[in-house]
């Protein structure tokens, strides 16, 4: 007989319900920091150990039911969607590299952008694309292979280059009208998108301008190769198709499928053998294997935390001793941030904590437009700096580097978070903050 169980969280867990997350962080982050090597402990092993621990501490279920509950999280529709995107992204990235699309796009970028504006140009491109398409994942999928190619050609540190793309991608993820997080935050707080946009704009644009200035300054020392190779315009077409369809708002999976087809058609036209194209796609998909395993293990572990009452425990603790508008806003920020830490999905974190945030806002007379902005901004902050988030995993997978090496080079999410904290402390923007 197959194991079945109610997925509604029943156990009323305390800190023990959150302990699998602590086990993972200790195994991966703390151990890696102690030995000063983030490749010493594979992230898959850290997740496997913490997942086994999460299953072991689950109460009220036999072993078969615990494994079933874990599998419910691993096979969640959001997790599965991420897996399909990873598969298509791997196939596109490798086939684009094999037929020369990445080299052609890199050469075009080096030709168009002055050396000293290369870093700033990549950041602006990531901000613009993410603002246009409303998704950080789509932006990272489109730009990371180009960032890798630019790093190889210019000698710029690879994790630093990829971090520019990841950081810029969260600008639009947080601000775009069509972002899932914008929709979730405005719907849960019953406010109009354009009003939330105004508040968000005032908070995060200063952060983006500060980081842009840093990249312009740091770019002064960048020098491109003395002779950029001739641009093969026809090989740039796959990337133009990917960027064009992404900006037009086409579903990211269809964007990647069109990109894969275009690399095949143009590759064969320019001399790539048909089966070499197939081989490149296979190599790309296989290369995403570790990333997919991490995603499944993380999904299962985080679902177990939810089932054991970890998120409910956080909510009850953070809302217990709230006083004053500042305290109320900080409690909402902490609420959505920790929920995001436990779900690794900023949209789900907002949906989970949105109703509680609305109650807090009503109780302390907070402006719902700023409440929506706080939910969106702090969920994006946490999503941007966790090593097991979809954005960090896909960026590290495409670049072949550790997620922690990217996090160590991130500027924008931390600056955005600092500006958001200052906005709460200084009651900014005044129009939407009231008295503290």
Show the residue positions of the predicted features.
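Juxtamembrane helix-boundary/capping and inter-helix hinge elements in multi-pass membrane proteins
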Residues: 61-63, 75-79, 155-159, 184-196, ...
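Hydrophobic transmembrane alpha-helices of multi-pass small-molecule transporters
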Residues: 1-87, 199-294, 433-436
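Hydrophobic alpha-helical transmembrane segments of multi-pass integral membrane proteins
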Residues: 83-92, 114-146, 318-358, 375
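Re-entrant/interfacial helical elements at transmembrane boundaries that shape
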Residues: 138-150, 166, 177-190, 346-360, ...
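Membrane-interfacial loop-to-helix junctions in multi-pass transporters
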Residues: 76-82, 107-125, 151-161, 205, ...
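Alpha-helical transmembrane segments of multi-pass membrane proteins
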Residues: 85, 116-129, 155-172, 327-340, ...
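Juxtamembrane and boundary regions of transmembrane helices in multi-pass small-molecule transporters
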Residues: 2, 167-170, 174-229, 234, ...
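Core transmembrane alpha-helical segments of multi-pass membrane transporters/permeases
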Residues: 44, 48, 56, 67-100, ...
């Amino acid at each position: 007989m197959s194991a079945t169980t109610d997925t509604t969280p029943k156990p009323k867990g305390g800190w023990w319900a959150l302990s699998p997350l602590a086990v993972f962080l200790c195994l991966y982050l703390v151990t890696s920091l102690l030995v000063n090597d983030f490749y010493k402990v594979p992230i898959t092993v850290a997740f496997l150990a913490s997942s086994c621990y999460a299953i072991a501490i689950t109460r009220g279920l036999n072993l078969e039911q615990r494994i079933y509950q874990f599998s419910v999280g691993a096979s969640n529709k959001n997790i599965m969607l991420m897996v399909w995107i990873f598969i298509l992204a791997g196939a596109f990235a490798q086939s684009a590299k094999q037929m020369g699309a990445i080299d052609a796009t890199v050469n075009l970028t080096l030709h168009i952008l002055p050396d000293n504006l290369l870093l700033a140009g990549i950041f602006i491109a990531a901000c613009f694309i993410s603002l246009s398409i409303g998704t950080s994942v789509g932006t990272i999928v489109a730009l990371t292979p180009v960032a890798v190619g630019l790093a190889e050609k210019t000698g710029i540190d690879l994790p630093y280059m990829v971090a520019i793309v990841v950081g810029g991608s969260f600008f639009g993820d947080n601000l775009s009208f069509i972002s899932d997080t914008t929709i979730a935050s405005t719907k849960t707080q019953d406010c109009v998108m354009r009003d939330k946009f105004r508040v968000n704009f005032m908070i995060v644009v200063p952060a983006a301008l500060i980081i842009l200035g840093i990249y312009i300054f740091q770019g002064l020392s960048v020098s491109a190769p003395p002779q950029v190779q001739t641009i093969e315009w026809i090989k740039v077409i796959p990337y133009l198709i990917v960027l064009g369809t992404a900006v037009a708002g086409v579903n990211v999976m269809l964007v990647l499928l069109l990109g894969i087809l275009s690399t095949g058609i143009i590759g064969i036209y320019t001399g790539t053998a048909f089966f070499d194209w197939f081989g490149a796609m296979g190599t790309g998909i296989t290369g995403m294997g570790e990333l997919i395993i991490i995603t499944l293990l993380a999904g299962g572990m985080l679902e177990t935390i939810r089932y054991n009452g970890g998120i409910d425990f956080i909510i009850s603790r953070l809302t217990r001793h709230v006083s004053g508008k500042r305290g109320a806003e900080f409690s909402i920020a902490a609420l959505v941030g920790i929920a995001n830490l436990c779900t690794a999905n900023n949209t789900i974190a907002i949906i989970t904590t949105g109703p509680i945030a609305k109650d807090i806002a009503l109780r302390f007379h907070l402006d719902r437009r700023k409440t929506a902005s706080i939910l969106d901004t702090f969920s994006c902050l946490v999503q941007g700096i966790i090593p097991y988030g979809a954005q960090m995993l896909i960026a590290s997978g495409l670049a072949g580097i550790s997620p922690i090496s990217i996090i160590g080079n991130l500027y924008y999410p931390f600056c955005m978070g600092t500006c958001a904290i200052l906005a709460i402390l200084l009651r900014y923007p005044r129009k939407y903050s009231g008295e503290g």
